[in-house]
């Protein structure tokens, strides 16, 4: 049963911008979020509904990219006639009624539905992943791969983390409601709020005032897992733009010292900007420009967080273009980097202190296997605990966390 006819006249200008964004991703190699931001900045007069339509349609096409072009029966290309066919196929699968215009002349609903039923039986096609990644997932994860992959192909939830340095969850909920943003508290992790309906929260007064950050619930688990206390000396050695550093600072109640490090200066500048907005005065940033940085900090950290570069397979829901950018060679390179980071950075942990190894990957070769190899090589460390957060069980991003104590 089809819904009302798709309004091509209303949406065509928006669709052309979606196609521009897709070209940025698949031809020019831009990350999906960057491509979307590019077209959003060019169209500042768009309404909230325009922006929502563009974002949802753009990500839906990327998420189902292989399934869509397999149904069409053509190799992917960035020519407009192909993209209109892709869009039309996507609309039919959502039970939208297509208008009788030349743009959709090759889109025949009953044929699309027949092919969709056929190709849904093939997991790699149904979930739109490359064959090599599907085979790797099955090899590493086994029977659980099918349900994990299905969960990773769903749209992500929008989760906020309350900045407890400035407010609490109840007050934040109330203030957001005043601006028309409905939220619900979740049991999975404290101080987190979920938005049942997507809204542009970045234009709200609470965001401007540093009362919250957008951060997936699984990512929020990391700082809690570290068991940081006020007054500790903590090092976040792969801090990036500081999402986890800000959370750690809040749990430390701005008491002690939190050293946020990264090898990219522009990320640390962004971290400093975010820390100022959040009121996280305990954070100090430091650029990793040589291995001497680690030697100077040897044996100093009560807690050392290693949120290492990884495949990102645990966050495919919010970064679905990773499926088409990641290659086996890149994964192999990342695993070498992960092992090197463990070997080089671990010296910053003091005896009796704890190192927390984290990846947003669902692959054991980037998680459990890396930690096992490290422990075998370093007798001065002991594995205390491991935690695997799975998208098909908790309903959030996929993460691996390990708590490792330095014993000598």
Where on the chain are the PLM-derived regions?
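S-adenosylmethionine
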Residues: 1-408
């Amino acid at each position: 049963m089809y819904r009302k006819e798709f309004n091509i006249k209303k949406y065509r200008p928006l669709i052309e911008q979606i196609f521009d964004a897709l070209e940025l991703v698949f031809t020019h190699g831009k990350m999906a979020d960057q491509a979307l931001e590019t077209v959003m900045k060019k169209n500042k007069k768009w309404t909230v509904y325009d922006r929502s339509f563009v974002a949802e349609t753009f990500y839906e096409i990327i998420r189902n990219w292989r399934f869509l072009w397999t149904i069409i029966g053509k190799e992917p290309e960035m020519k407009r006639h192909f993209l209109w066919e892709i869009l039309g196929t996507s609309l039919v699968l959502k039970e939208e009624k297509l208008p009788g215009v030349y743009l959709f002349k090759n889109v025949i609903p009953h044929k699309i539905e027949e092919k969709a039923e056929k190709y849904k039986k093939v997991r790699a096609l149904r979930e739109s992943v490359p064959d090599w990644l599907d085979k790797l997932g099955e090899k590493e994860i086994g029977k659980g791969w099918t349900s994990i992959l299905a969960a990773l192909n769903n749209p992500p939830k929008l989760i906020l983390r309350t900045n407890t340095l400035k407010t609490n969850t109840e007050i934040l909920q109330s203030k957001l409601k005043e601006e028309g943003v409905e939220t619900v508290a979740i049991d999975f992790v404290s101080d987190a709020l979920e938005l049942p309906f997507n809204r542009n929260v970045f234009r709200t007064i609470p965001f401007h005032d540093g009362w919250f950050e957008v951060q997936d619930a699984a990512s929020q688990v990391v700082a809690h897992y570290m068991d940081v206390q006020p007054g500790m000396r903590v090092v976040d050695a792969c801090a990036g733009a500081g999402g986890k550093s800000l959370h750690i600072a809040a749990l430390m109640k701005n008491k002690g010292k939190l050293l946020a490090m990264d090898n990219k200066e522009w990320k640390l500048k962004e971290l400093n900007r975010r820390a100022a907005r959040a009121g996280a005065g305990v954070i100090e940033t430091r650029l990793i420009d040589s291995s001497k940085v680690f030697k100077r900090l040897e044996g100093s950290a009560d807690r050392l967080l290693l949120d290492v570069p990884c495949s990102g397979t645990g966050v495919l829901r919010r970064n679905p273009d990773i499926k088409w950018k990641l290659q086996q060679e890149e994964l192999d390179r990342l695993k070498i980097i992960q092992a090197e980071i463990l070997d080089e950075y671990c010296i910053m942990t003091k005896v009796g202190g704890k190192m927390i190894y984290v990846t947003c990957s669902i692959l054991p070769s980037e998680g459990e296997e890396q930690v096992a190899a490290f422990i075998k090589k370093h007798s001065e460390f002991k594995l205390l605990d491991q935690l695997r957060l799975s998208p098909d069980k908790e309903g959030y991003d996929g993460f691996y966390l390990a708590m490792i104590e330095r014993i000598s």
